[in-house]
């Protein structure tokens, strides 16, 4: 198995760059950073934002409303796709005088292009995280504080000079919203949980990164068919399926008919409305003759193609080089990728004895791949779990007044639900370990709130 994505290789070797640092270096070569930064600073200057990092990510994530564009005299060439990062500098109307020429020097550009934190995070990471979580603050919070402070220190003077602001009074975004010791996130928009009326549901959203797991294929949705065909060509080469004939511009119907001929099952589905951009996905499964190898390929929009199609019949050099020197199927890789998720599920089952099912009365759950990771969202319906006679006000009071409340803001972003004021939402960072989450379940719910889910 190719280990280039395995960060464990670098734990004891500080001289080697991390996978994230290599990704950042590649990004600087692949993208026109100058154009992206032009957009960012143009928007910040015209918005006169005192929280520039939030404004920057919102703009680059394509989240500006039409009204906001009119307010700031920004004209974006059509077609403008919702939640799609803008990669070309905006065209400004005649009555909109850009301040960039005066304040944005080559020296500033040079600093912004090369400034990468010690953790390797860069502008690309921030944009992508917001794409993966377009309606959730998690897209902003996952950037480490060290990076945000460095970026902010570079463009804050530009904003202050342009708007005659005192740099000492300009809001320091990172210092108030990040735990700089543990580099974990806290709420960007602190809600008053006491304002959540009639608490009836609690939702947990737990995220995990899959950047180290090469079984996930990230494909551009516009080139979906072409990429599927390329993957099938690779499978064909490995398995020598002579009767497999392909077309570069194969439509969905032809593709499905072709797959059926070679014992493939294909399942097309959309996780959400495509306008929300929470990833349109396709799944292809292959069953080998010995019923032992299952190929599961998830096609997620954008980013990169990771080609690792290990079949039981294909023991190439990469497979031979794995540490156990054993034959490895793609099914083994798939199972290994979700060990962490399985551990989490087992921990929850161990403590509370409920089945982790998609519909289990008071408990519903959903697993979704999101960009470079996956999330598992679990919603507990307190009304069904505890009954109508339960004292929800007392439960809410315990949540708010617990001396452990602040402790767990380092583990979960605790907020309300935009669409329902009866739901309390706990959103985890990928940096949080399963042990910390398990501790949260036991200590917060069992010891503090007195709830036992059995």
State where each predicted segment sits.
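Long, Pro/Ser/Thr-rich low-complexity/intrinsically disordered regulatory tracts in eukaryotic proteins
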Residues: 74-377, 386-454
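Glycine-rich tight-turn/loop motif centered on a GG-T
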Residues: 381
